[in-house]
């Protein structure tokens, strides 16, 4: 069976109109919840530290945080320690959220025959992750679902020729399996490669 001239033209136009670039933005989930927990932790840490210092100087730095019945050693010094840890940890986590650490994109560019995986790192030199491969090296897509007690991990990997599988989607908060399959099939369809099991 041969195509008519008009059908050939339409087929070529369809190929020309096909997207040449697939880009998936990777964003942090549950930012509002993380903001809430870290602000609560920060305020709690400040409260502990103030009570610990108040027990040391024998005077309440803030009137509603009563430290009159707390002995500096061992209770006060312990509260100072936990308060300092809470403050430092929450500030670090807030900094990670503000700077978008772990966010980035997956880009598949047929024009350049190039795949780019970019993730933002912490502030500092060479902390960002920027991985590139030729599209020809991609052999397939692999979906992985792990049930570890109460923790469900959902991952999508690229199977790279002569290399370890490369994670491109990593979800600590589970989504519907159909949604995960949809994301994986979008990449597989664009690259024309197979999807392999769970």
From Swiss-Prot:
Q: Which InterPro entries match?
A: PSI_Ycf4_assembly
Provide one Gene Ontology biological process annotation.
photosynthesis
Q: What does this gene product do?
A: Seems to be required for the assembly of the photosystem I complex.
UniProt keywords, alphabetically: Chloroplast, Membrane, Photosynthesis, Plastid, Thylakoid, Transmembrane, Transmembrane helix
User: Which superkingdom is the protein from?
Assistant: Eukaryota
Topological type in the membrane? Multi-pass membrane protein
Give the location in the cell. Plastid, Chloroplast thylakoid membrane
Taxonomy of the source species: Eukaryota, Discoba, Euglenozoa, Euglenida, Spirocuta
| Record-stated family | Belongs to the Ycf4 family.
Gene Ontology CC annotation, any one? photosystem I
* Name this protein carries in UniProt: Photosystem I assembly protein Ycf4
Say which species the protein is native to.
Answer: Euglena gracilis
Residue spans crossing the bilayer: 35-57, 70-92
State where it is primarily located. plastid
């Amino acid at each position: 069976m041969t195509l008519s001239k008009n059908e050939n033209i339409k087929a070529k136009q369809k190929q020309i109109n096909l997207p040449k670039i697939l880009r998936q933005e990777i964003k942090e989930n549950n930012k509002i919840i993380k903001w809430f927990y870290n602000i609560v932790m920060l305020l709690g840490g400040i409260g502990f530290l103030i009570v610990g210092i108040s027990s040391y100087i024998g005077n309440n730095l803030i009137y509603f945080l009563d430290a009159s019945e707390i002995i500096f050693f061992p209770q006060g010094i312990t509260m100072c320690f936990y308060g300092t840890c809470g403050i430092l940890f929450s500030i670090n986590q807030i900094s990670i959220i503000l700077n978008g650490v772990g966010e980035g994109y997956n880009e598949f560019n047929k024009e350049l025959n190039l795949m780019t995986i970019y993730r933002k790192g912490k502030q500092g030199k060479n902390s960002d992750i920027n991985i590139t491969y030729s599209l020809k090296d991609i052999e397939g897509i692999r979906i992985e679902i792990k049930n570890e007690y109460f923790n469900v991990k959902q991952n999508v990997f690229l199977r790279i020729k002569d290399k370890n599988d490369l994670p491109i989607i990593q979800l600590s908060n589970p989504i519907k399996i159909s949604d995960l399959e949809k994301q994986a099939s979008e990449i597989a369809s664009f690259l024309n490669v197979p999807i392999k099991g769970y």
